[in-house]
Structures are given as structure tokens and as C-alpha cells.
UniProtKB/Swiss-Prot annotation:
Recorded name of the encoding gene: fslM-1
Paired cysteines (S-S): 30-100, 42-93
Family note: Belongs to the G-protein coupled receptor Fz/Smo family.
Residues exposed to the Cytoplasmic side: 265-273, 339-354, 419-439, 516-623
Glycosylated residue positions: 57, 106, 109, 154, 159, 169, 199, 239, 463
Disordered: region residues: 552-590
Name this protein carries in UniProt: Frizzled and smoothened-like protein M
Length: 623
């Protein structure tokens, strides 16, 4: 039993000793230093310029490229204490350009080379002083071939017996340079891609101009659009915003023209939705203005170095328009929710508060939009697609506060609407009321969930901003290791979540178009409007009827009849043209409908069909 323990102990000692012996690269060699690059002045900090170790799978040229990148990052985001210490540069240069010892076999004339590695404590002290995270560069990393520490505590051991040197445990002390007064003038204008250099003497003033510096001591600025996504993904988001803005503008404009301009009898219901649709139109128009100017990329200035701010007219104008009418839309949407509940609960009792509510809503919207205008706080939202209110305190006070309050109140009204409908259906056993209210309910609910998402998205991003900024180190690591740094991204909201946010701020006109604009009443308004009742349209109709009546038929009698009909029709039309201007009665309505509709189409609009539907609750008949 004792002998077994002795054998195990011997094997353990042998294994430990074998693990401390570093392998020798037979193709490794000692080379003379090839010289500094403009970004990496290592000649001041290397211990021996005549003996640099180069392994079989490395070159000094590749090492200098890596050093250029690290010197660039050091100049861009390094702390002043880190950049002013010569030990930082001695350590950095010696990691990628280690010292070298060589041995020659006198019999075979073969020369071998072994590196002089940086000491672990030196590496650890420098990375700690410079604030380098371990996942970015770790002094605990091991060499891939041997599995031994890349930075030994004291020395490295080599077995040189096979190279006629005769020492099986040859030791090379690790290199632990000391700080001295050697100074280095880094190229302060160099910034590693994709950062931009901006010569700044006042970071605070330049921040107000739209620049975002990576640190207080650096003149390197964050690129725009912010590398949350690749350029291709940003283009997809920009195209989504442009497309929805155009569609929403035309959808809301159609509703305004139909129910406010062409409509011969505008009801209070039309006016209520008109104020909301008008606000949506102007919100969407701000996106169209941006689209015409070149899309969201037009808000990015100086080749991507800065974002648009208040002093840029395109930004301040579109930001003001969006804020003004976004608040307006929120307030009128809240009124629509209250109006819907009132109509469901009281049915025939009118709600006459528009004349008070409208001026109050416009006043609130104007004040909440002028405040950021007066304080010059409209600027592009970094990592987004439009200009809007700057500073969290103003955003929360002038937008998200009112939005949160409105959502709270509207949630109550939506619940009350559902409850009232439930009571009516339960009392009558009929679901007709639900059919009557389905479109208004959908309109309220769809917009409600859009507002809720905007509210939640903003506060989620604010609460997780540290996670985004905390991934900047990983971003720089990617730029160093990637063949295409433009593919590197900073951690942040997923592209799907930002895409849905863009959808929510641009979709309202499309929602309203499908829920309000595609119905029989809208078609009748257009059919009887001046758009289809003017001399030009009348002339086209006459020509079309003439061509139709003069076309060949299967029998001569039919042709004669057609000709007679044409003569009569033309005679009647000419007679009426001489006596009066064309009106609906002078035209053949068959061009638009199979049936001749009466003027009763212009009776008071009754969107809830109160006149045509009797609702019985218990023994009471409500009309």
C-alpha cells in the first residue's frame, strides 16, 4: 500500500514538472526590430532592439498592426494615469515584441530561439491601472499549444538537452520593466475605426453641438448612427420609417379631405375624429419632410461624427412639429375614449364639451412644445430615427408624463366601455351593440397599445442603458479582431424592438384609414363631391357614353336604338348645360352605382345607429 502512494506521488511530481516546461518552437527566431510605425513608438521601450522573438506563425509586421490598434485605443479611451506611465508602453510593446535568447548546436549548426515573457505581476499591475476588463485582456490567459501561462510568475523553463546545450531545466527570467521618465507623444488625432476624430478644446460645448466623446480626455467621438446595428440593418429601419410616414400621411389626409372638406354635413363626430386625424397627419408629415430631405440619414452630420441639434433647421422644425401634434393626438385620443364610453352608456344623451376641450387641448400642446423650443432642446435621438425633445427631465415632464396620465385614464374608460357593453348584452341577450361599436373600439384599443409600447420602450431603454454602455469594451474587442469592423455592434435594444417602436410612432394614419375611411358613407361623400361632379368629369362621361352607344351590336335595331338613345341623351345634356351648371341631377349616376341614391344620404350622420336600432334593457325600450 505504501509503495502505491509513492508511485502516485512520483507520477504527480513528474506531471507537475512536465507542465512547467515550455515547448520550443524549432522555427522560432530572433530578429532585429523592424522599426516604429507612426502610431507605435516601441523603440523607446523595448529592452533589446537587436533581439526580438518571432515564432513560426507570427511576423513583426502583424505584431505592429496589433500594436497600432492598441496604441490607438489607448490614446482614444485610456485614462490619463495610464497614458502618462512609461510602464504601460514597455509592457504593451514587450507583450507583442518579446525579448529573445538563442542557442546554436555546434555539431548541427542549428539555432533555436526562446522568448522572454512579461511577468504576471507586471501585466496585472498595468491592466489594473489602465482599467482593462479581464474579458477584454486577461493576464491569466494560457498559451494555446502548451496550456501553460502566457505570463509566468517568475521564469519560464525549457528542456535544451535535445539541442546539445545539456540543460534539461534551463530557466529564463520573466521581464518586469520599471517605470521611468520616458515620455511618449501619442498620435492624438488617431482614432480606431469606426470612431471619428474631432479636434475639440471644449467637450461640453461640442456635446451641445451633437458630438459624443468616448471619454473626457479623448477627442474620439462615437459614430452615427450609433453602432447598435450594422449599416444594412439601419437602412432597413430607415426605410420602414419612410414608408410608414408616407402611407400614414396619405391615409390621414384622405380622412381629412373626405369627412371635413368634401363632406356636405360635418357632424360633431366628424369634428372629433378630424382633430385627431389632423394631428396624426402633421405627425406623419414631419416624417415625410424628413424623407424628402434624404431620410433619417439627413440628420447625421460631418460624415457621421455628429447628430443634428437645435441649430440645424431640419431637426428643430421636424422635432417641433412632431412634439406639438403628438401631444395633440394623445389629448384628442383620450377624448375619443371618453366619448366612446359616454355614447355607449347614455346612447341618446349628447356630449357637448368639444367647444371647451379643443382650445384647452391646443393650448396644452402648444405650451409643451414651445418649452423645448425656447430652451433649444430639440435634437436627434441618438440611436433612433427622428428629432425630438432632448434631456430626460423634459421628455418625462412634457411627453411621457402626459402620456402616462392619459394611458391611465384611458385604461379606465376602455374598461368601462367593455363593462357597459357586457351589461347591455347580458340584459338584452343580443350582441348588436358590439357590432355597432367594433370600429371605434378597435381604433381606441390599437392606438392604446401603440402608446403603451412607446411608453414601455422608453423606460426599458433608460433602465438598461448601463448594459449598453457596459458593452463598449466588447465592441472595441470586436473591432480589433474582426476583418470588417463595420460589422461590430454595441449591445442595446434588439432591432425588432426598435423596429416596432418606429412602427408605433408612424402607424396611426394607416390604422385610421382602414377603420374610418373604407365604408359606405365615405364612398357616397366622394361620389357626390365636386371631384366627380365637375365639367371635366361630365365631359369624360359623355364621351364614354357616346363610345358605348355607338359600338357595333348584333342587330340593326339595337344599333338604331342605341343611336336614338345617344341623341336623346346628348340633347338632354346639352339642354341642361345651357340652362345651368352641372349638378348631380344632370348626370347618370350609373357611372358610380347601380342604384340612384336619394338626398337622404346627407341626413345627420349617425355612426352608432341610434335611430335605426332599439336596445331593450329589461322592460325598458331605449331608442
Amino acid at each position: 500500500m505504501k509503495s502505491i502512494f509513492i508511485i502516485i506521488f512520483i507520477l504527480y511530481v513528474f506531471q507537475v514538472n512536465s507542465q512547467t516546461i515550455y515547448p520550443i518552437d524549432p522555427s522560432g527566431k530572433c530578429e532585429q526590430y523592424i522599426g516604429d510605425t507612426p502610431s507605435s513608438p516601441c523603440s523607446k521601450f523595448l529592452n533589446n532592439l537587436d533581439s526580438i522573438y518571432v515564432s513560426s506563425n507570427a511576423t513583426q509586421q502583424n505584431a505592429m498592426k496589433k500594436l497600432d490598434e492598441y496604441f490607438g485605443i489607448l490614446g482614444a479611451i485610456g485614462t490619463s494615469g495610464c497614458k502618462s506611465d512609461s510602464l504601460t508602453y514597455k509592457t504593451l510593446c514587450s507583450i507583442y515584441l518579446p525579448g529573445c535568447e538563442s542557442f546554436t548546436n555546434n555539431q548541427t549548426n542549428i539555432t533555436i530561439a526562446i522568448p522572454k515573457r512579461i511577468c504576471y505581476n507586471t501585466c496585472n499591475n498595468v491592466t489594473t491601472k489602465c482599467g482593462v476588463p479581464k474579458f477584454y485582456f486577461s493576464c491569466d490567459q494560457i498559451e494555446p499549444v502548451s496550456g501553460l501561462p502566457m505570463f509566468p510568475l517568475n521564469y519560464s523553463e525549457f528542456n535544451l538537452t535535445n539541442y546539445d546545450v545539456g540543460n534539461p531545466n534551463y530557466t529564463v527570467q520573466c521581464y518586469g520593466p520599471l517605470s521611468d521618465n520616458t515620455m511618449v507623444n501619442l498620435d492624438s488625432s488617431y482614432c480606431p475605426p469606426p470612431l471619428f476624430y474631432h479636434n475639440s478644446t471644449d467637450h461640453d460645448a461640442d456635446y451641445d453641438r451633437g458630438y459624443l466623446f468616448v471619454s473626457e480626455t479623448s477627442n474620439c467621438v462615437v459614430p452615427n448612427p450609433v453602432p447598435l446595428y450594422t449599416n444594412e440593418q439601419w437602412d432597413q429601419l430607415y426605410n420602414l420609417s419612410n414608408t410608414l410616414a408616407v402611407l400614414s400621411t396619405f391615409g390621414s389626409l384622405y380622412l381629412l379631405v373626405t369627412f371635413i372638406i368634401l363632406n356636405p354635413k360635418v357632424t360633431s363626430f366628424d369634428r372629433m375624429y378630424g382633430f385627431f386625424n389632423g394631428s396624426v397627419f402633421m405627425m406623419s408629415l414631419s416624417g415625410v419632410i424628413l424623407f424628402i430631405a434624404g431620410g433619417p440619414r439627413a440628420l447625421i452630420k460631418d460624415g457621421g461624427a455628429r447628430i443634428s441639434v437645435f441649430e440645424d433647421p431640419l431637426c428643430s422644425s421636424t422635432g417641433f412639429i412632431f412634439q406639438l401634434f403628438a401631444i395633440n393626438a394623445i389629448l384628442f385620443w383620450a377624448y375619443m375614449g371618453f366619448d366612446l364610453w359616454w355614447r355607449v352608456k347614455y346612447i341618446t344623451k349628447p356630449l357637448n364639451i368639444q367647444k371647451y376641450y379643443v382650445p384647452i387641448a391646443f393650448t396644452i400642446s402648444f405650451i409643451f412644445s414651445v418649452i423645448p423650443l425656447a430652451t433649444k432642446n430639440y435634437r436627434m435621438v441618438r440611436g433612433n430615427i427622428h428629432c425630438w425633445v432632448h434631456k430626460a427631465v423634459l421628455q418625462n415632464t412634457l411627453f411621457f408624463g402626459p402620456l402616462g396620465l392619459t394611458l391611465t385614464i384611458s385604461t379606465g374608460f376602455i374598461g368601462l366601455v367593455i363593462y357597459e357593453i357586457y351589461k347591455i348584452v347580458k340584459a338584452t341577450g343580443r350582441g348588436g351593440i358590439m357590432k355597432l361599436e367594433i370600429k371605434p373600439i378597435l381604433n381606441i384599443v390599437l392606438i392604446y397599445f401603440s402608446f403603451v409600447y412607446i411608453f414601455a420602450f422608453n423606460f426599458h431603454n433608460d433602465n438598461n442603458s448601463k448594459n449598453t454602455y457596459g458593452s463598449i469594451d466588447e465592441f472595441f474587442q470586436c473591432t480589433l479582431e474582426s476583418d470588417d469592423p463595420s460589422k461590430c455592434t454595441v449591445g442595446g435594444p434588439s432591432i425588432g424592438s426598435l423596429g416596432y417602436f418606429i412602427y408605433c410612432i408612424r402607424i396611426y394614419g394607416i390604422y385610421c384609414f382602414f377603420l374610418q375611411g373604407l365604408n359606405e358613407r365615405a364612398f357616397k361623400i366622394w361620389k357626390r363631391s365636386i371631384v366627380f361632379n365637375n365639367r371635366f368629369i361630365l365631359f369624360i362621361k359623355v364621351k364614354l357614353f357616346s363610345m358605348d352607344n355607338n359600338s357595333p351590336s348584333e342587330s340593326g335595331n339595337s344599333s338604331t336604338t342605341a343611336g336614338t338613345s345617344t341623341t336623346i341623351n346628348n340633347s338632354n345634356i346639352n339642354k341642361k348645360n345651357n340652362n345651368s351648371k352641372p349638378t348631380l341631377s344632370t348626370m347618370d349616376s350609373n357611372a358610380f352605382s347601380k342604384n340612384n341614391d336619394s338626398d337622404s344620404d346627407f341626413d345627420d350622420y349617425d355612426p352608432y345607429h341610434k335611430k335605426q336600432n332599439d336596445i331593450e334593457i329589461g322592460s325598458v325600450n331605449i331608442k
